[in-house]
């Protein structure tokens, strides 16, 4: 289990021409969705995360078009479950930053995942990425954000 750490994150959101004036290659939010599973642990299979699957589907994930993913899993088991729920293929680069296993900044972890994907798109290291945030000890709440470059 990852160590809990202090930390923070800030992301600048801008639309259209303003975004283009701030950087050469903006990372555009193409889809975002948040879903919640039951917090009662006895009512679902803990080897799955249905809310993560649904959030990814509604955000617009298509596994053949995801270059990289930053997943907020605080254990390697959670990362494995989430990779499966998102339908990531073998070519998708996962948690190049080290992910939340390296350090879990709790409430900033999701935004950090988004900033990591955006940073790689802005620097032309990727064209399309998935950023994920979760809350709850058993992946009960899941947010998926799909970002793309131009």
For each predicted feature, which ranges?
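Claisen-condensing/thiolase-fold acyl-transfer catalytic domains that form or cleave C-C bonds
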Residues: 1-150
């Amino acid at each position: 289990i990852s160590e809990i750490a202090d930390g923070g994150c800030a992301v600048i959101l801008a639309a259209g021409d303003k975004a283009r004036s701030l950087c050469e290659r903006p990372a555009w939010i193409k889809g975002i969705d948040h879903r919640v599973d039951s917090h009662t642990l006895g009512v679902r299979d803990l080897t799955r995360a249905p809310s993560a699957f649904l959030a990814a589907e509604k955000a617009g994930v298509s596994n053949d078009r995801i270059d990289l993913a930053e997943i907020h899993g605080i254990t390697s088991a959670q990362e494995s479950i989430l990779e499966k729920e998102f339908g990531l293929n073998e070519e998708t680069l996962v948690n190049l930053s080290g992910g939340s296993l390296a350090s879990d900044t709790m409430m900033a972890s999701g935004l950090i995942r988004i900033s990591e994907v955006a940073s790689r798109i802005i620097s032309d290291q990727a064209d399309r990425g998935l950023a994920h945030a979760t809350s709850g000890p058993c992946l009960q709440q899941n947010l998926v954000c799909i970002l793309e470059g131009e």
